[in-house]
Amino acid sequence: MERAAKKEAVEALNEVFKTTGVAVVAHYSGLTVAQMQKLRMQMKQAGASVKVSKNRLAKIALEGTDVVAIGSLLKGPTVIATSNDPVAAPKVAVEFAKTNESFVILGGSMGKTVLNVDSVKALASLPSLDELRGKLVGLLVAPATKIAQLSTAPAAKLARVVQAYASKSEAA
């Protein structure tokens, strides 16, 4: 790799690390190309991304970012999964590790907080931001729905009484 290409790679990685909400580091030794493509696809669908680069270049790119602490995890063949959503990358990484023994999570970072393997797994078990937003909207809409049901209930009861009276009159 030429010096200019290395500089470009470091700058690109640095931008990714500056804007990311969470980063997960894992060993991927022994994964097939098809498995790596599957991982990349799953990450992309979840709104996350996967980066494989030389550890030395990644350590340089980490300087001046919040996730600089993961530099100590970059030993051997490592992959770095990043996402803005604090749950997306850990969730996909943990699920992928369950089905692929060659994919071993080493740890990660959420902002300036260093995460060990258990912390990454705990983060993966949380609901995503979209799920939380859906629950919040449901909670906000529920009272309005109940009020609408209560306001239409008397009219519905009156209509049923009139219908019953009309049915009774026809039968007589």
Swiss-Prot record:
GO terms for biological process: translation. SUPFAM superfamilies: Ribosomal protein L10-like (SSF160369). GO terms for cellular component: large ribosomal subunit. Keywords: Ribonucleoprotein, Ribosomal protein, RNA-binding, rRNA-binding. GO terms for molecular function: large ribosomal subunit rRNA binding; structural constituent of ribosome. Belongs to the universal ribosomal protein uL10 family. Part of the ribosomal stalk of the 50S ribosomal subunit. The N-terminus interacts with L11 and the large rRNA to form the base of the stalk. The C-terminus forms an elongated spine to which L12 dimers bind in a sequential fashion forming a multimeric L10(L12)X complex. Forms part of the ribosomal stalk, playing a central role in the interaction of the ribosome with GTP-bound translation factors. HAMAP family: Ribosomal_uL10. This is Large ribosomal subunit protein uL10. It comes from Nitrobacter hamburgensis (strain DSM 10229 / NCIMB 13809 / X14).
